[in-house]
């Protein structure tokens, strides 16, 4: 599978990318949501891992742009965040249109659970 990670934290990008590569997947990374919109539109990704809190543009705003763009509207997107309250998670998934949520710090088990939900 092919994934895109959008996260301003180099540590978080590297941790998630390393785990996905160990699992045998192809991974691209973006350090900002500003750069990532064109990458999402140009690439064919099975899943986009999207950080919620980023300096230039948060994940909620970025995802709204993805959903409003017909070529990317159906892109499978998973929010990644250290925010763990049910209200924040539900807001992100339901209101902003994310397909799932991956808590930080990531681990192999949580990644495998998210990957198991990707539609074939």
State the predicted function of each range.
Residues 105-115:
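C-terminal output helix
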Residues 44-49:
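Active-site beta3 strand of CheY-like receiver
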Residues 54:
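Receiver (REC) domain active-site loop signature in two-component systems and cognate sites
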Residues 10-28, 96:
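Two-component/phosphorelay signaling modules centered on CheY-like receiver
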Residues 35-36:
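Short alpha-helical segment
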